[in-house]
Amino acid sequence: MSVIHWSGAVIGLIIAIILILRKVNPVYALFGGAIIGGLIGGASLANTAQAIIDGTNSVMGSVVRVIAAGVLAGILIESGAAEKIAETIVEKLGEKKVLLAIALSSMIITAVGVFIPVTVIIVAPIALPVARKVGITKSSILLAMIGGGKAGNIISPNPNTIAVAKGFNVELAQVMMGAFIPAIIGLVVTYVVATLISKKGELIKESEIPARVDNKIKPGFGKAMVAPIIAVILLALNPIANMLHIKFLSTVQIDAMYILPIAGLIGLFAMGQRNKILEYTTAGLNRMMPTVMILIGAGAIAGIISKSNLSDVVVYCIQQTGISGVFLAPISGILMAAATASTSTGAIVATGTFGNAILAVGVAPLSAAVMINTGAVVIDHLPHGNFFHASADAVKMNIKERMKLMPFESIVGGSMAITATIIYGFLI
């Protein structure tokens, strides 16, 4: 039985969003909104505290998996494997297809568990000299990196995908595989749009190309791909076995909590850098800690919402308006990611806030997970988030030019959300 009125939950969520927009630390903003929402909704101090504790407990599964993913991400980034993958793709596709090479390399690097901001930082020094040589603009290459990153993100073991999989109690690999077609559409749209704007905006100056003084000995491409390939194979093992009705393999269920670190460690040994295990895994953990804290904060506000009657109110409103409940999944992902300017936080909050309501209107758990996850990449790049500024800095782009790129990013994200909605909302 709900103990919190829906209005309190909504007010708490709005307060959290306003605090985030005012540059308050997102973790404190989410906790603050949760406390205020619980009290306004009529809960006692004790009940509010218990709802928040229950909410944070509900995200612990995602927290553990995100921490585990830090092993793989840390090894790929610190060993130079991610950079080697990008270099090889750009080199093989050549100057004539530089935008496709940039988008594809960004997609692959993000798909194996690297955050989009980090992907842009890795790919930018490789892309800038080639882009200047062929005469394409900053806007074009940045869109290629961002669009490719968005496409990779929805099929990656990144926090947003982990959170929606856990929130709807489906396998991580199912969500990753389920978003594959939308991701391919996103990659194609990225290439087309980036090509169309390749002569628009500022050209790259010689002085803006960073000097690449790197004493790190990077692994060969084959060795760099060992960890990603093993991760993909192990994650896909059970879903593929179920699809093909292979009884023996379908009974083998290995959680991402095991798969991602194991893949990373095997990759590390394959690259001959076993002596760097502590250094790389520590770096990976440090990269994941901000996301872990946001997960806990999002769990707090989700706890308040789950103890309210908001889901019932949302379902009633949808039924009264006659709008298909299918649209609630992508729209919630879009709005929450826009409010928080974060794919991960948006996906987490959308799942916790609207998950029950989405299931109540008849949407299957896997469909809901994929649609929220793709919706979360539509307008997650707004200026009140770190990604907006980090991506601009990677290519030395001023704020005015960076703002002009936002509609094109939304076109890419929107193409993936629309594709997912058509497939999982109407075709399946």
What are these regions, as identified by a protein language model?
Residues 28-31, 47, 51-83, 108, ...:
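Core transmembrane alpha-helical segments of multi-pass membrane transporters/permeases
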Residues 2-9, 13, 36, 40-41, ...:
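Long, contiguous bundles of hydrophobic transmembrane helices that form the permeation core
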Residues 71, 84-86, 117-130, 158-168, ...:
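Re-entrant/interfacial helical elements at transmembrane boundaries that shape
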Residues 128-225, 364, 387-424, 428:
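Membrane-core helix-loop-helix motifs of multi-pass transport proteins
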Residues 96-109, 134-154, 175-180, 184, ...:
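Alpha-helical transmembrane segments of multi-pass membrane proteins
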Residues 67-68, 92-126, 296-298, 321-363, ...:
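Hydrophobic alpha-helical transmembrane segments of multi-pass integral membrane proteins
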Residues 3-7, 57-62, 89-104, 133-141, ...:
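Membrane-interfacial loop-to-helix junctions in multi-pass transporters
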Residues 22-26, 60-62, 73-83, 110-122, ...:
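Short helix-coil transition sites and intra-membrane helix breaks within transmembrane domains
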